[in-house]
C-alpha cells in the first residue's frame, strides 16, 4: 500500500509546540471515525456532523474521515517530557486538501487523502507500529 502524504511545513522534529512532524518509532494508540462517511470533519477528535466533499478555499488544517492517534515509543526522542508525540496530539488523518499531498503543508500531523486514510484505517489496528523517518 502506497499513498501520497503531507508532513509538517516546519520540517521534522519532536519538540512540543514546534508544529513539526515527529520522527522515530510510534504505535497507533487510538482509532477514530470507523463507519463514518468519507470527508467527515472532526474537531477535538469528535465528528462535527459536517462532511467536506470538495477542496475548501481556506488553508485551514482540516481533519477528516479517520484519525489514527500516534504514541511515541522512544523515551527521550518522541516519548516523555516536551517530546511526547501523544501529548502533542500527532495523528495520521484525512484531509480535503488533496492538492497539497506530496508536499510539506501540515502542522505536524501526517495527512492523507480521505480515500487512502480510510483504506489504511481498515488495514491496521491499535498497537500497529509506525516508523516516521
Predicted segments, located by residue:
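N-terminal post-signal-peptidase region of extra-cytosolic proteins
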Residues: 3-18, 47-55, 114-115
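Short, surface-exposed secondary-structure junctions/capping segments
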Residues: 13-32
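Well-ordered beta-strand positions in beta-sheet-rich domains
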Residues: 2-4, 25, 129
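Exported/periplasmic cell-wall-interacting domains
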Residues: 36-133
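Residues that form or immediately flank small-molecule/cofactor binding pockets and catalytic motifs
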Residues: 10, 33, 97
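Surface loops and adjacent helix of pleckstrin homology
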Residues: 5, 31, 122
Amino acid at each position: 500500500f502506497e499513498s501520497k502524504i503531507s508532513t509538517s511545513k516546519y520540517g521534522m522534529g519532536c519538540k512540543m509546540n514546534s508544529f513539526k512532524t515527529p520522527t522515530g518509532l510510534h504505535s497507533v494508540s487510538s482509532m477514530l471515525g470507523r463507519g463514518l462517511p468519507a470527508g467527515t470533519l472532526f474537531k477535538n477528535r469528535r465528528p462535527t456532523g459536517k462532511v467536506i466533499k470538495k477542496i475548501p478555499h481556506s488553508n485551514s488544517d482540516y481533519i477528516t474521515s479517520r484519525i489514527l492517534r500516534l504514541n511515541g515509543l522512544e523515551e527521550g526522542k518522541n516519548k516523555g517530557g516536551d517530546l511526547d508525540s501523544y501529548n502533542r496530539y500527532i495523528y495520521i488523518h484525512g484531509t480535503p486538501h488533496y492538492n497539497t499531498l506530496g508536499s510539506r503543508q501540515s502542522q505536524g500531523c501526517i495527512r492523507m487523502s480521505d480515500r487512502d486514510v480510510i483504506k489504511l484505517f481498515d488495514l491496521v489496528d491499535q498497537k500497529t507500529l509506525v516508523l516516521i523517518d
